[in-house]
């Protein structure tokens, strides 16, 4: 499908952003403001976006479950970037479906209603999560079955809905990052810190499997490139760091950066995974998808993003770790970061938002 001709922008762009007070959305918001783009953010709590407002962003209060609020925020914009999501597979299945699937449907409906020409949505490499190594996989490689885990399946459905919506009037692009890490992470990183303090971040086996990582500012830059690229509509792109690391290498560097105990070897995958499958659904048990993400090798081919988005990751893991350490220090250290850790969304809150929106 061809893109609307005005979807390729040379100057400042008017962008509406969901998830701007979160980890990934926050990085995208800062990048857009650094560039001088005109930014409107849709947030549930205006006070959480005060720093963005101070930098010139327009703050609109509304829920992802309210397509009318999204449409109001989107009027006059060129691009909508959908970065709201749930990073943890431990959220309830209902919360995952409401936020990831229904939220994406609402964003797309609102964007079309508001007359936008382009949407860029953040998907995940987990849409192909399975009990297989995914080494040198590109966007053409797919699973013969649904991915493993409620979150992965919800992400997969949301991505399919988004890409099937793309047409000559509303161009939709999906970005698939790997393990997203870096400054601003108040969801996954606090959990890793607690785990490290309990004896080290656990691996399954010796951690010699490859791990596909994506520094958060690299992801933000890829999103901006996708919003401007003429060949992006209706396409999906893997985005990752410029280095290929084994899990143990990445966790060693992360632990050292945060002055935490190093990662620890755990039971072999051949034992841990079947046990997790049997125990799935029991409170507190390690989820099968959590083991897959840490034990199976992942290395995604990013040549399509290089060729079609003119985007190439340049921030090294070492540089990203330095920025992560600076952010933690500016927060006041690990204890201050842990105090700000974000809880998982609960069903009751989402139901209230849906009811208020008439969903």
Q: Which residues does each PLM region occupy?
A:
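A conserved pocket-lining segment of Rossmann-fold NAD(P)-dependent short-chain dehydrogenase/reductase
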Residues: 92, 143-146, 194-214, 218
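N-terminal Rossmann NAD(P)H-binding glycine-rich loop of SDR-like oxidoreductase domains
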Residues: 15-35
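Mid/C-terminal beta-alpha module of Rossmann-like enzyme folds, strongest
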Residues: 225-286, 302, 321-325, 332-345, ...
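Substrate-positioning beta->alpha
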Residues: 153-157, 185-190, 205-227, 234-238
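NAD(P)H-binding glycine-rich loop region in Rossmannoid oxidoreductase-like domains
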Residues: 47-53, 57-102, 106, 110
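Short alpha-helix in the Rossmann-fold core of NAD(P)-dependent oxidoreductases
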Residues: 97-104, 108, 120, 151-155, ...
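Conserved Rossmann-fold NAD(P)-dependent oxidoreductase catalytic core, especially the SDR/UDP-sugar
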Residues: 105-150
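Catalytic helix-loop patch of NAD(P)-dependent Rossmann-fold dehydrogenases
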Residues: 133-180, 201-204
């Amino acid at each position: 499908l061809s893109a609307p001709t005005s979807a390729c922008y040379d100057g400042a762009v008017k962008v509406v952003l969901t998830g701007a007070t979160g980890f990934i959305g926050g990085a995208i918001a800062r990048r857009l403001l650094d560039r001088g783009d005109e930014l409107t953010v849709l947030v549930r709590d205006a006070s959480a976006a005060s720093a963005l407002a101070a930098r010139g962003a327009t703050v609109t209060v509304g829920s992802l479950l309210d397509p009318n609020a999204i449409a109001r925020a989107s009027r006059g914009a060129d691009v909508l970037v959908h970065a709201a999501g749930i990073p943890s597979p431990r959220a309830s299945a209902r919360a995952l479906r409401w936020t990831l699937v229904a939220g994406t449907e609402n964003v797309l409906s609102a964007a079309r209603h508001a007359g936008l020409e382009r949407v860029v949505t953040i998907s995940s490499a987990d849409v192909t999560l399975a009990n297989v190594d995914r080494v040198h996989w590109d966007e053409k490689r797919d699973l013969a079955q649904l991915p493993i885990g409620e979150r992965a399946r919800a992400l997969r459905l949301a991505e399919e809905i988004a890409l099937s919506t793309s047409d000559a009037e509303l161009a939709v692009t999906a970005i698939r990052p790997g393990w997203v890490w870096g400054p601003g992470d108040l969801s996954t990183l606090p959990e890793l810190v607690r785990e490290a303090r309990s004896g080290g971040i656990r691996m399954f086996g010796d951690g010699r499997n490859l791990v596909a990582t994506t520094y958060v500012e690299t992801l933000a830059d890829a999103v901006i490139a996708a919003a401007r690229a003429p060949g992006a509509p209706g396409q999906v792109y893997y985005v990752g760091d410029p280095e290929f690391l084994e899990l143990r290498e990445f966790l060693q560097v992360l632990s050292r950066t945060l002055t935490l105990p190093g990662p620890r070897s755990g039971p072999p995958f051949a034992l841990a995974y079947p046990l997790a499958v049997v125990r799935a659904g029991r409170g507190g048990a390690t989820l099968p998808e959590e083991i897959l993400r840490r034990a199976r090798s992942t290395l995604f081919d990013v040549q399509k993003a290089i060729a079609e988005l003119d985007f190439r990751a340049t921030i090294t893991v070492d540089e990203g770790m330095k920025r992560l350490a600076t952010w933690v220090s500016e927060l006041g250290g690990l204890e201050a970061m842990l105090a700000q850790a974000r809880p998982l969304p609960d069903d009751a809150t989402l139901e209230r938002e849906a009811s208020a929106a008439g969903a």
